[in-house]
């Protein structure tokens, strides 16, 4: 919860600004309106032949559960560049980013998750700081019950259900 204005240090009130319909943090001194918008999570579905690379999370939330390499987009970074960076950080891979595969609104967390299909040219991978293990799984052997997040499951199912010629991305909303 915001207590002070980042522009002038003044106190903050939470109310609906004039000509708006959503409550916002507003400075009582300089009238600056502080907009809070959803955060973007970017990730990839790294494929090597008929296998997908998953990371066993070393951090909360959902430590010790499998996930796709993904994380928050940084300022000044494009979606695909962010997906590559996250894959490098979590699995020590350099994926070739392909088509957009899934976009998921995660309303309760104020996030939008964006996943790309990614190609791995070789078997060079390892555990980054946020991973306990990194492993390739055949698409028929994905550990669905041990997956960390619904959004990762949605992206994986989109990968499984796509043909090489069908790359219309999946769009879902989670409450």
Predicted regions and their residues:
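Short cysteine-rich clusters marking metal-coordination/redox-active sites
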Residues: 5-8, 27-30
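Short linker/helix segments within small regulatory modules
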Residues: 16-24
């Amino acid at each position: 919860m915001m207590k002070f204005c980042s522009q002038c240090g003044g106190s903050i009130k939470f109310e609906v600004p004039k000509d708006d319909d959503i409550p916002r943090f507003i400075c009582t001194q300089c009238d600056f309106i502080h907009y809070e918008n959803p955060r973007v999570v970017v990730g990839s579905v790294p494929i090597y032949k008929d296998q997908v690379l998953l990371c066993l999370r070393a951090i909360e939330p959902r430590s010790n559960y499998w996930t796709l390499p993904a994380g928050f987009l940084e300022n000044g970074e494009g979606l695909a560049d962010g997906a590559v960076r996250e894959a490098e950080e979590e699995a020590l891979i350099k994926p070739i980013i392909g088509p957009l595969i899934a976009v998921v609104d995660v309303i309760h967390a104020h996030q939008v998750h964006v996943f790309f299909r990614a190609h791995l040219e070789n078997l060079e991978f390892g555990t980054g700081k946020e991973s306990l293990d990194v492993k390739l799984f055949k698409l028929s052997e994905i550990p669905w019950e041990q997956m960390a997040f619904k959004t990762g499951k949605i992206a994986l199912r989109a990968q499984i259900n796509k043909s090489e010629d069908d790359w219309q991305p999946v769009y879902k909303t989670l409450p």
